[in-house]
Amino acid sequence: MRWLPLLALIVSPLASAVTLDELQQRFTGQPVVRAHFEQVRTIKDMPQPLRSQGEMLIARDSGLLWDQKAPFPMTLLLDDMRMVQAINGQPPQTVTADNNPQMFQFNHLLRALFQADRRVLEENFRIDFKDLGAGRWSLVLTPKTTPLDKIFATLDLGGATYLETIRLNDKQGDRTDIALSRHQLTPASLTDDERQRFAAP
């Protein structure tokens, strides 16, 4: 699933995640979040996992930007109107609700998911939220609607002050682990360069 990085891209700090409602308040209360990511994809029957890393940005009013640096350059931009992916200098590919409605609906749902929108979570997942103590928490989501239930067995999130780990367990027995670090909340608005990247055709 080359669109799996989308699952990593809505990230906000959590001061003390005790309830799901608190998660929602924290996730929606940060205008811009930047972080470093490291992703490990473990594929059944492959001897070595696939590793990648880079930088991500989520802007509440603009969308998300996934900027992979290694092992090859890849950018993924998602806003309310389109999803644009460019790999290693190749011409970008654009997905909209018109040319791929199911994929766009899937990605739009993921954006709402990682804002911890309780209504969306309850409509689409069975929820297992736990306060682990010492400021740490876990959230296990089991899909119950299509297309998520056709792709994933569970989505496991964890963290403390910030969302730190994401594990995607898919129906084929493969696993994707994403570690997020170096979170930055400032500047609280997009820089000129970031704004131009979201505005690019």
Predicted regions and their residues:
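Gly/Pro-enriched, hydrophobic low-complexity segments
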Residues: R118-P201
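Amphipathic hydrophobic-ligand
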Residues: Q48-E55
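Positively charged n-region of N-terminal signal peptides that target proteins for export
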Residues: M1-L4
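Short beta-strands and strand-coil junctions in structured, solvent-facing domains, enriched
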Residues: K44, F72-M74, P147-L148, P187
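An acidic-aromatic
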Residues: E55-H108, T176
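Flexible, processing/modification-adjacent segments and terminal tails
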Residues: V18-I43, P49, I87-P143
